[in-house]
Amino acid sequence: MTNIRKSHPLIKIVNDAFIDLPAPSNISSWWNFGSLLGVCLTVQILTGLFLAMHYTSDTATAFNSVTHICRDVNYGWLLRYLHANGASMFFICLYLHVGRGLYYGSYTYTETWNVGVILLFAVMATAFMGYVLPWGQMSFWGATVITNLLSAIPYIGTDLVEWIWGGFSVDKATLT
């Protein structure tokens, strides 16, 4: 008589993915962070979509829309806090994932490592946009401080910063 976990078509999929996974015996918990990145990214996308359904980018009503999300939307406060803290968890997992790669010498696989570096820069640019877009003084501060780093580029730095800002300083809502 065969074992049900190896003969049943649906249970066999779960068995092959979780129980009889062909993984080396010396694998450590450091290898979980890639999967945790996927979980965090999924949570970020889903909570971001649900928050975007109620968010208003107009400067006069943006704060009221956040208040509406927290008070009137069912579990809106939970969505907001999951989205905010999920971003922090995402970057913690990301840095631990990169640290694991450095520790185990994954940089010797240059093609794979270069793709990872490009993905890291893309994630940082996306996080910057997500940080700067909402209305508020903190996003103004973030936009000013982070983009001012470009002013260190010789000759074109100041012009580049003014081009990104659209003027001499960050002003109005950055989302519209």
Swiss-Prot record:
What's the domain of life for this entry?
Eukaryota
Name a GO molecular-function annotation. Answer: ubiquinol-cytochrome-c reductase activity
- What is one process in the GO biological process aspect for this record? mitochondrial electron transport, ubiquinol to cytochrome c
Q: Which cofactor does it need?
A: heme b
**Keyword tags:** Electron transport, Heme, Iron, Membrane, Metal-binding, Mitochondrion, Mitochondrion inner membrane, Respiratory chain, Transmembrane, Transmembrane helix, Transport, Ubiquinone
Provide the protein's localization: Mitochondrion inner membrane
Where it mainly occurs, coarsely classed, is mitochondrion
**Pfam families xrefs:** Cytochrome_B
Q: Where on this chain does heme b b562 bind?
A: H83
Give me the segments passing through the membrane: 33-53, 77-98, 113-133
What does the entry's cofactor note say about binding and number? Answer: Binds 2 heme b groups non-covalently.
Q: Which InterPro entries match?
A: Cyt_b/b6_N (IPR005797), Cytb/b6-like_sf (IPR027387), Cytochrome_b_N_euk/bac (IPR048259), Di-haem_cyt_TM (IPR016174)
Membrane topology, as annotated: Multi-pass membrane protein
Q: Gene Ontology terms, cellular component aspect? A: mitochondrial inner membrane
Q: Where does heme b b566 bind?
A: H97
Subunit relationships? The cytochrome bc1 complex contains 11 subunits: 3 respiratory subunits (MT-CYB, CYC1 and UQCRFS1), 2 core proteins (UQCRC1 and UQCRC2) and 6 low-molecular weight proteins (UQCRH/QCR6, UQCRB/QCR7, UQCRQ/QCR8, UQCR10/QCR9, UQCR11/QCR10 and a cleavage product of UQCRFS1). This cytochrome bc1 complex then forms a dimer.
Role noted for this protein: Component of the ubiquinol-cytochrome c reductase complex (complex III or cytochrome b-c1 complex) that is part of the mitochondrial respiratory chain. The b-c1 complex mediates electron transfer from ubiquinol to cytochrome c. Contributes to the generation of a proton gradient across the mitochondrial membrane that is then used for ATP synthesis.
The record's comment on protein family reads: Belongs to the cytochrome b family.
Instruction: List other remarks.
Output: Heme 1 (or BL or b562) is low-potential and absorbs at about 562 nm, and heme 2 (or BH or b566) is high-potential and absorbs at about 566 nm.
Protein's name in the database: Cytochrome b
Q: Which gene encodes it?
A: MT-CYB
